[in-house]
Amino acid sequence: MDSYKTQWLTSEGDERVRCELLAFGTVEDLERGTLNAQDRNVLVKLSILNYVYGKQVVTFDALLKNYAQAGIELTDNDIEMILLELCNHGIMDVSIDSVAREVKVLQLSRYRDVYCGERELLVVNPTKVITNIEIIDTLQAYSDKL
């Protein structure tokens, strides 16, 4: 199956918006585009990955607040189930402390498409996507530390 980005590059209309949201978006972008229930669930999972990217510890309150701002009500159990599903798929590895209500991010694999300016973004905020320039800068900073 092609990546959402590959589909986005060749699609038009509603399908383009759908693929753009799934390739680069988060739940915060939903107000500018609509998704069916299945795609919305995928975006909820992808949004967790976006939120934890670059963080070592994330609180349940922060995750729940992030979703609430997008009009999506989740429970602690919902968050735990999503995290466990992502771990089972090998996308990430976390340590969940249900009592302290926090998640320690142990490992996060490449998980989202990278925006390289191929087309204009219609619904996703371009300042919030992972770009090729950001990746190059991160690699350069890492290389400089060696």
UniProtKB/Swiss-Prot annotation:
InterPro entries: Csn9_fungi (IPR016806)
The keyword Cytoplasm is annotated on this UniProt entry: yes
Keyword DNA-binding tagged: no
Location of the PCI domain: 1-107
Gene Ontology process terms (BP): protein deneddylation
Localization terms from the record: Cytoplasm; Nucleus
Keywords from the UniProt entry: Cytoplasm, Nucleus, Signalosome
Superkingdom assignment: Eukaryota
Gene Ontology annotations for the cellular component aspect, listed alphabetically: COP9 signalosome; cytoplasm
Main location: cytoplasm
Function recorded in the entry: Component of the COP9 signalosome (CSN) complex that acts as a regulator of the ubiquitin (Ubl) conjugation pathway by mediating the deneddylation of the cullin subunit of SCF-type E3 ubiquitin-protein ligase complexes. The CSN complex is involved in the regulation of the mating pheromone response.
Subunit-level organization: Component of a COP9 signalosome-like (CSN) complex.
Annotated protein name in UniProt: COP9 signalosome complex subunit 9
Highest classification ranks of the organism: Eukaryota, Fungi, Dikarya, Ascomycota, Saccharomycotina
